Amino acid sequence: MTRDGAYDLFERELEAVRRRYGFVVAGYVLMPEHVHLLVGEPRRSPLSVALQVLKQQSSRKLKSSGEAQFWQRRYYDFNVHNGEKRVEKLRYMHRNPVQRGLVEKPEEWPWSSFQHYATGKIGTIEIESEWTARRREAETVQQLRLPPFARS
Protein backbone atom coordinates (compact mmCIF):
# COMPACT_ATOMS: atom_id res chain seq x y z
CA MET A 1 0.00 0.00 0.00
CA THR A 2 1.28 3.46 -0.80
CA ARG A 3 1.64 6.13 1.86
CA ASP A 4 -1.29 7.96 0.23
CA GLY A 5 -3.36 4.78 0.52
CA ALA A 6 -2.44 4.48 4.20
CA TYR A 7 -3.52 8.08 4.83
CA ASP A 8 -6.82 7.48 3.01
CA LEU A 9 -7.41 4.32 5.04
CA PHE A 10 -6.72 6.17 8.28
CA GLU A 11 -9.13 8.98 7.34
CA ARG A 12 -11.89 6.43 6.72
CA GLU A 13 -11.18 4.72 10.05
CA LEU A 14 -11.17 8.03 11.93
CA GLU A 15 -14.56 8.94 10.46
CA ALA A 16 -15.99 5.50 11.30
CA VAL A 17 -14.79 5.75 14.92
CA ARG A 18 -16.00 9.38 15.14
CA ARG A 19 -19.50 8.27 14.16
CA ARG A 20 -19.46 5.19 16.39
CA TYR A 21 -18.41 7.05 19.54
CA GLY A 22 -20.07 10.38 18.79
CA PHE A 23 -17.18 12.79 19.11
CA VAL A 24 -16.44 16.03 17.32
CA VAL A 25 -13.34 16.43 15.16
CA ALA A 26 -12.33 20.09 15.07
CA GLY A 27 -9.13 19.45 13.13
CA TYR A 28 -6.56 16.89 12.11
CA VAL A 29 -3.25 16.53 10.29
CA LEU A 30 -1.75 13.20 9.24
CA MET A 31 2.04 13.25 9.28
CA PRO A 32 4.43 10.50 8.13
CA GLU A 33 5.01 9.20 11.67
CA HIS A 34 2.28 10.76 13.80
CA VAL A 35 -1.20 12.29 13.79
CA HIS A 36 -2.50 15.57 15.20
CA LEU A 37 -6.13 15.45 16.33
CA LEU A 38 -8.21 18.22 17.87
CA VAL A 39 -11.31 16.45 19.12
CA GLY A 40 -14.09 16.81 21.66
CA GLU A 41 -14.94 14.28 24.35
CA PRO A 42 -17.08 11.46 22.92
CA ARG A 43 -20.74 11.21 23.91
CA ARG A 44 -20.65 7.42 24.19
CA SER A 45 -17.41 6.61 26.05
CA PRO A 46 -14.17 8.15 27.31
CA LEU A 47 -11.82 9.57 24.68
CA SER A 48 -9.16 7.04 25.65
CA VAL A 49 -11.49 4.19 24.59
CA ALA A 50 -12.30 5.81 21.23
CA LEU A 51 -8.61 6.44 20.53
CA GLN A 52 -7.70 2.88 21.53
CA VAL A 53 -10.28 1.52 19.07
CA LEU A 54 -9.03 3.89 16.37
CA LYS A 55 -5.43 2.78 16.92
CA GLN A 56 -6.33 -0.92 16.97
CA GLN A 57 -8.55 -0.87 13.88
CA SER A 58 -6.28 1.30 11.77
CA SER A 59 -3.15 -0.61 12.86
CA ARG A 60 -4.73 -3.96 12.01
CA LYS A 61 -5.80 -2.79 8.55
CA LEU A 62 -2.50 -1.06 7.83
CA LYS A 63 -0.52 -4.09 9.00
CA SER A 64 -2.57 -6.45 6.82
CA SER A 65 -1.79 -4.21 3.84
CA GLY A 66 1.96 -4.38 4.52
CA GLU A 67 2.30 -0.84 5.90
CA ALA A 68 4.83 -0.25 8.67
CA GLN A 69 3.82 0.76 12.20
CA PHE A 70 2.06 4.09 12.16
CA TRP A 71 1.29 4.82 15.80
CA GLN A 72 3.52 5.97 18.58
CA ARG A 73 3.08 3.97 21.78
CA ARG A 74 1.46 6.82 23.67
CA TYR A 75 -0.64 9.83 22.87
CA TYR A 76 -0.20 13.27 24.35
CA ASP A 77 -3.24 15.29 25.20
CA PHE A 78 -3.76 18.96 25.83
CA ASN A 79 -7.05 20.43 27.01
CA VAL A 80 -8.33 23.36 24.97
CA HIS A 81 -10.70 25.51 26.99
CA ASN A 82 -11.34 28.51 24.75
CA GLY A 83 -11.60 29.61 21.14
CA GLU A 84 -8.27 31.41 21.18
CA LYS A 85 -6.41 28.26 22.22
CA ARG A 86 -8.38 26.25 19.64
CA VAL A 87 -7.23 28.57 16.85
CA GLU A 88 -3.64 28.40 18.15
CA LYS A 89 -3.67 24.59 18.11
CA LEU A 90 -5.27 24.44 14.63
CA ARG A 91 -2.63 26.81 13.26
CA TYR A 92 0.15 24.75 14.81
CA MET A 93 -1.28 21.52 13.41
CA HIS A 94 -1.92 22.88 9.91
CA ARG A 95 1.56 24.44 9.74
CA ASN A 96 3.32 21.24 10.83
CA PRO A 97 3.80 19.86 7.28
CA VAL A 98 5.34 23.23 6.28
CA GLN A 99 7.64 23.29 9.32
CA ARG A 100 8.80 19.78 8.46
CA GLY A 101 9.57 20.76 4.86
CA LEU A 102 6.95 18.46 3.33
CA VAL A 103 5.17 21.31 1.53
CA GLU A 104 5.57 25.06 1.13
CA LYS A 105 2.03 26.03 2.19
CA PRO A 106 -0.54 24.32 4.46
CA GLU A 107 -3.06 24.05 1.62
CA GLU A 108 -0.63 21.82 -0.30
CA TRP A 109 -0.84 19.04 2.32
CA PRO A 110 -3.93 16.99 1.41
CA TRP A 111 -4.18 14.97 4.64
CA SER A 112 -5.46 17.63 6.98
CA SER A 113 -8.51 19.69 7.83
CA PHE A 114 -6.92 22.83 6.37
CA GLN A 115 -8.97 22.73 3.14
CA HIS A 116 -12.15 22.51 5.17
CA TYR A 117 -11.30 25.69 7.05
CA ALA A 118 -10.05 27.51 3.95
CA THR A 119 -12.90 26.63 1.59
CA GLY A 120 -15.59 24.67 3.43
CA LYS A 121 -14.67 21.57 1.42
CA ILE A 122 -16.31 18.41 2.71
CA GLY A 123 -13.82 15.58 3.00
CA THR A 124 -13.86 12.07 4.39
CA ILE A 125 -13.89 13.27 7.99
CA GLU A 126 -16.69 15.52 9.20
CA ILE A 127 -15.06 18.59 10.72
CA GLU A 128 -17.01 20.61 13.26
CA SER A 129 -16.72 24.28 12.32
CA GLU A 130 -18.76 27.31 11.31
CA TRP A 131 -18.84 25.89 7.76
CA THR A 132 -20.43 22.70 9.09
CA ALA A 133 -22.94 24.60 11.21
CA ARG A 134 -23.98 26.74 8.23
CA ARG A 135 -24.35 23.67 6.01
CA ARG A 136 -26.53 21.93 8.61
CA GLU A 137 -28.65 25.05 8.99
CA ALA A 138 -29.13 25.31 5.22
CA GLU A 139 -30.09 21.62 5.03
CA THR A 140 -32.63 22.10 7.83
CA VAL A 141 -34.15 25.11 6.08
CA GLN A 142 -34.33 23.12 2.84
CA GLN A 143 -36.06 20.23 4.62
CA LEU A 144 -38.60 22.63 6.13
CA ARG A 145 -39.42 23.97 2.67
CA LEU A 146 -40.20 20.50 1.30
CA PRO A 147 -43.77 19.21 1.42
CA PRO A 148 -44.21 16.86 4.42
CA PHE A 149 -44.47 13.74 2.24
CA ALA A 150 -41.13 14.54 0.51
CA ARG A 151 -39.08 14.75 3.74
CA SER A 152 -36.80 11.87 4.59
Task: Give each language-model segment a name.
Residues 1-152:
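Short catalytic/metal-binding and nucleic-acid-binding patches
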